[in-house]
C-alpha cells in the first residue's frame, strides 16, 4: 500500500538527492 508507493518514490528520488547531499558535505 502506502509504504510500497513511498519505497518506489524513494528509489526514484535517491539518485537525485544523494549527489546534492554529497556536494554539501
From Swiss-Prot:
Record carries keyword RNA-binding: no
This protein's GO CC annotations: extracellular region
Protein keywords: Amidation, Amphibian defense peptide, Antibiotic, Antimicrobial, Immunity, Innate immunity, Secreted
Record PTM Leucine amide, positions in chain: 25
Organ and tissue specificity: Expressed by the skin dorsal glands.
Coiled-coil blocks: none
One Pfam family named in its UniProt record: Caerin_1
Annotated InterPro entries: Caerin_1 (IPR010000)
Role of this protein: Antimicrobial peptide. Adopts an alpha helical conformation which can disrupt bacterial membranes. Strongly inhibits the formation of NO by neuronal nitric oxide synthase (nNOS) at micromolar concentrations. Acts by a non-competitive mechanism, probably by binding to calcium/calmodulin and as a consequence blocking calmodulin attachment to nNOS.
Similarity comment: Belongs to the frog skin active peptide (FSAP) family. Caerin subfamily.
Official protein name in the record: Caerin-1.8
Organism: Ranoidea chloris (Red-eyed tree frog)
Lineage, top ranks: Eukaryota, Metazoa, Chordata, Craniata, Vertebrata
Amino acid at each position: 500500500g502506502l509504504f510500497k508507493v513511498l519505497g518506489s518514490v524513494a528509489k526514484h528520488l535517491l539518485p537525485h538527492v544523494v549527489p546534492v547531499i554529497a556536494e554539501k558535505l
